Each structure stands twice: as C-alpha cells, then as structure tokens.
C-alpha cells in the first residue's frame, strides 16, 4: 500500500467536511490539510491572479510532501483550474469538488434546482457546462453568496451567527413558479455543510440539501490501492496535520483543528508572494 499522504487543500476550513468522510473510509491513510486562510475568501479574486497564486502554493507543497493524491476541497478552485493543476503536475492525481448538479437533476421531482455557491463558482463557465450537460430540462437557480463561507468559519470558531443575515443569503434559492417550487438545493461550497442546521431552520419550505462530501470520499478511496491486510484493522502510521498560510493563528483555530484530529504545524514557509 502506498504510504504517502493524501493532501487536502481549501481556502479555509470548509474542506474538513470532506476530510471527515474520507477518514471513515480510509482511516489508515495520513492526511495533510492545507488551508490558505491568508487568501480567504477566493470568491472575489481575479481569476489569473488566483491561478498563479494556487500554482505557486502547489509547487511548494508537492516538492515538500510528495503526496499520493491531492484533493482540491474548494469548489471555486475546482471549477476554475483543475486542468491547469493536472497539466502543470501530471505525475499527481487531483480530485476536485464541483457542484453536484447531476445528482440534483436525478433527485428533483419538481424540476426546480438551486445551486448555493460562492460568487466565483456561480460565474464559472464550467458550472454552466454542468447545467447544460446534466440539468438541461430543469430550472436551475444559481445563487452566489459572499457571506456564507465566512459565517461557516465563524460558526466553527464558536462565534454567534446572525440568523437574519443568513436567511437573506439563502432566500434566493427558494423559487416558486407555475405551481412548482424548488425541491433540491446543491451545497456547492465545502464550507456550507457546517451551516446545514441553520439552513434547515431558515428554509421557506422543506427541501433536499445535497452535500457531495461522501461521494467525493468514495472517489478518493477508489483511486488509492487497497490494503493487503484485509482481515486486520488498519493502523495509521503517521499523524494527520494541518498547515495554514496565515501567520496569524488564533487559539480558537488551533482548538478547532485539534477537534478534527489535526496537529497544527507552525512556522511553515509557503514562499507566497504578496498580491
């Protein structure tokens, strides 16, 4: 079995929703979680600048850690530049997180779907390609929120969430027309599942919320070789750890990562140029 780590990457803590599902399926694997909190949020970055920024980070990470596989646990980056990453680093498998529009189209009964994402994901051509390919017969409402990812970060650090402000962010997802209404909402940002209880409380009516984390974890598992010791409980040889690009690491952040079983590695130089 390949003992190299699996590297997760996100702009913040949203990718932890996918990491926790991957751990269930492959507990013996070492995971490295990288949060580019210095660059958070990605939704409003200029595309070319963001691409260069991400490629610089991965040039450093892949040299330093030689992962068996990289998970881009960020919808904004996944819809923007998976092809760029695969082209620049052809020796490394990359798994992306893209809006689960196909699943939504398969599950909807009304034909009304909403995609709750960041502004960056909403405006990507790739998102529209997914809609045209898998949901051409559906009414698809794209909703780009500038605040929800930040709300998720605050919530996990124990801060109070303004329920009314959150409600305003999700209201456009609820569409009613010609006697039909939205019945499926895609969570197209890995941060958003952390807010699912708030979403259900503030929803105008009952809907199916699609979190693709489990499906992504299964895909990750399928790309890794099976352990030869099938009848033995898998043993993790190396501790999981997290890296943050920001040098302003708070006690609440460190406590949060510890709660997810991640040791915070400090004083790591990412050699990122200031934008």
From Swiss-Prot:
What InterPro entries does the database record attribute to this sequence? Asp/Glu/hydantoin_racemase, Asp/Glu_race, Asp/Glu_racemase_AS_2, Glu_race
Q: Please give the catalytic activity noted in the UniProt record.
A: L-glutamate = D-glutamate
Pathway named in the protein's UniProt entry = Cell wall biogenesis; peptidoglycan biosynthesis
Top EC category? isomerase
Q: Which UniProt keywords apply?
A: Cell shape, Cell wall biogenesis/degradation, Isomerase, Peptidoglycan synthesis
| EC code(s) of this entry | 5.1.1.3
Q: Name one Pfam family in it.
A: Asp_Glu_race
Q: Which GO terms describe its biological process?
A: cell wall organization; peptidoglycan biosynthetic process; regulation of cell shape
One of the entry's Gene Ontology molecular-function terms is:
glutamate racemase activity
Q: Spell out the catalytic residues.
A: 74, 189
Amino acids binding substrate: 10-11, 42-43, 75-76, 190-191
HAMAP family in alphabetical order? Glu_racemase
Question: What task does this protein carry out?
Answer: Provides the (R)-glutamate required for cell wall biosynthesis.
Q: Which family does it belong to?
A: Belongs to the aspartate/glutamate racemases family.
Protein's name in the database: Glutamate racemase
The gene coding this protein: murI
């Amino acid at each position: 079995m390949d003992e190299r780590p699996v590297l997760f990457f996100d702009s913040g803590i949203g990718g932890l929703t996918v990491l926790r599902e991957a751990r269930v399926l492959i507990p013996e694997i070492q995971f490295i979680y990288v949060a580019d909190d210095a660059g958070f949020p990605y939704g409003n970055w200029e595309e070319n600048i963001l691409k260069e920024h991400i490629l610089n980070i991965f040039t450093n990470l892949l040299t330093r850690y030689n992962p068996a596989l990289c998970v881009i646990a960020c919808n904004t980056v996944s819809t923007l530049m998976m092809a760029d990453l695969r082209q620049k680093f052809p020796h490394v498998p990359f798994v992306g997180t893209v809006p689960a529009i196909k699943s939504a189209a398969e599950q909807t009964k009304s034909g009304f779907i909403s995609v709750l994402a960041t502004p960056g994901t909403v405006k990507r051509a790739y998102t529209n390609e997914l809609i045209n390919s898998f949901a051409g017969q559906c009414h698809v409402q794209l909703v780009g929120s500038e605040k929800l990812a930040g709300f998720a970060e605050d919530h996990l650090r124990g801060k109070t969430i303004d329920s009314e402000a959150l409600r305003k962010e999700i209201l456009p997802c609820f569409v009613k027309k010609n006697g039909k209404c939205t019945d499926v909402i895609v969570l197209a940002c890995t941060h958003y599942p952390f807010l699912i209880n708030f979403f259900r409380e503030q929803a105008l009516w009952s809907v199916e919320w699609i979190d693709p984390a489990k499906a992504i974890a299964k895909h990750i598992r399928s790309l890794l070789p099976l352990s030869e010791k099938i009848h033995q409980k898998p043993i993790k040889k190396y501790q999981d750890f997290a890296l943050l690009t920001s040098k302003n690491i708070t006690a609440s952040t460190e406590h949060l990562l510890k709660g997810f079983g991640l040791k915070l590695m400090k004083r790591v130089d990412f050699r990122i140029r200031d934008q």
